Design a protein with these regions (language model features):
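Active-site cores of enzymes that catalyze phosphoryl transfer or operate on phosphate-rich substrates
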Residues: 100-155
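Gly-rich Lys/Arg/Thr-decorated short loops/hinges at beta-loop-alpha junctions or inter-strand turns
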Residues: 149-168
Length: 365
């Protein structure tokens, strides 16, 4: 519905983009059937290596629609690429006297998204709210994918200079946001793609800070999304936070995890409970003895049989056994079940699995 293509086309990623491009009234060109350039590696988004530790009073700030913003700011597009244009900073030059196809289509999708978000707020039933939420998310995803098609080496609109220009200008935008915070006395502890985590004493001070940053970096806009009373930084894309303020308002603590094992569905509930309790304890500022006591209690419950099935993992057979190059983990449990229980799991079957004292995996229903 959004891009006016049939349902079979939607999963193909680049085809919906083609549909949007050819609907643009100002675009009079053609979409090549095959890419015109050989694949070239280019630098992607920046991810700062954090210093592991526990931090307090951490503000999470995002650059609003960063790729879209930089496409518009520098007029990055296939249709504006010109030796006589303005250098975006990495040597690629773009004509500033006419609007580019990429920016126009991104603008169209953003206008649509704002319409859907307004309809979602006006909705009076859960069904309507879900419908408009799905539509606004679809437009957001479509805008993000429009950058991606320029870097897809199998697509007719592939152009390494376009993709590299977008990622270069976006990295520079993130670096500038980082410098703005550091120079104003708010240390940045982590940064990823379009967001930074910096130490700010209070949400109120964070609001004042982001207002000054937006004045300095206009037309690029930064949003103050969350404020964490405490945060654990472990590594790139691996962190946990105790969020107590979101989008302008205080609320009860919410524990937010990114890239940590307890998010994996296959992990045993008991292991998730242990990790969740440990992380919450650290975020809440509890003493190590208190956290150790909690974990000792879990271990004792496991040894006495109180945890039951929460000690078990979930497994799924992804392909026939003969197609696995090596048999290990949960798949080894499937082999054990076949040999000892005469249980023959089929592709996509799910099962419970456990590990014996000797490292042997067992699978059963």
């Amino acid at each position: 519905h959004l891009v006016q293509c049939d349902i079979e086309t939607v999963p193909m990623t680049t085809a919906p983009a083609t549909s949007l491009f050819i609907q643009d009234e100002q675009f009079k060109g053609r979409i090549p059937d095959d890419p015109r350039f050989n694949k070239v590696d280019y630098e992607g988004a920046d991810v700062q290596e954090p210093e592991p530790g526990r931090y307090t009073n951490m503000a999470i700030m995002d650059i609003k629609a960063m790729y879209h913003s930089n496409v518009k700011l520098h007029n990055i597009c296939w249709t504006t690429l010109s030796e006589d244009g303005k250098d975006c900073g990495n040597g690629s030059k773009f004509d500033q006297d006419k609007s580019g196809l990429l920016g126009r289509v991104m603008d169209k999708m953003t206008v649509k998204r704002n319409e859907y978000k307004a309809l979602m707020k006006q909705a009076t039933t859960d069904a309507d709210k879900r419908k408009w939420d799905a539509m606004q998310f679809a437009t957001k995803s479509m805008v993000a994918s429009l950058y991606g098609v320029s870097g897809d080496s199998k697509y007719g609109m592939y152009h390494p200079d376009i993709a590299a220009a977008i990622t270069y200008t976006s990295r520079q935008t993130l670096f500038r946001l980082r410098d703005e915070c550091n120079d104003r006395g708010y240390p940045v502890r982590y940064g990823h793609t379009d967001s930074i985590f910096c130490e700010v004493p209070s949400p109120e001070e964070g609001m004042q800070l982001v207002a000054k940053i937006n004045e300095s970096m206009a037309p690029i806009e930064t949003e103050f999304e969350k404020w964490c009373e405490s945060m654990i930084l472990k590594a790139k894309n691996r962190y946990a936070g105790k969020v107590t303020w979101t989008d302008g308002g205080y609320h009860d603590p919410e524990y937010y995890y990114k890239g940590l094992e307890l998010k994996q569905a296959r992990m045993p509930k008991a292991m998730k409970s242990a990790m969740d309790g440990t992380l919450r304890g650290i975020l809440d500022g509890k003493d190590r003895e208190d956290i150790d006591d909690y974990l000792i209690g879990l271990i004792n419950d496991g040894n006495t049989g109180k945890l039951g099935e929460s000690l078990l993992m979930k497994g799924r057979l992804r392909r026939p056994l003969h197609k696995y190059k090596s048999i290990s983990g949960a798949v080894a449990g499937v082999v054990w079940a076949k040999e000892h229980l005469d249980k023959r799991y089929q592709v996509d079957d799910t099962f419970l699995t456990a590990i014996g004292a000797g490292g042997q995996y067992y699978a059963f229903d």
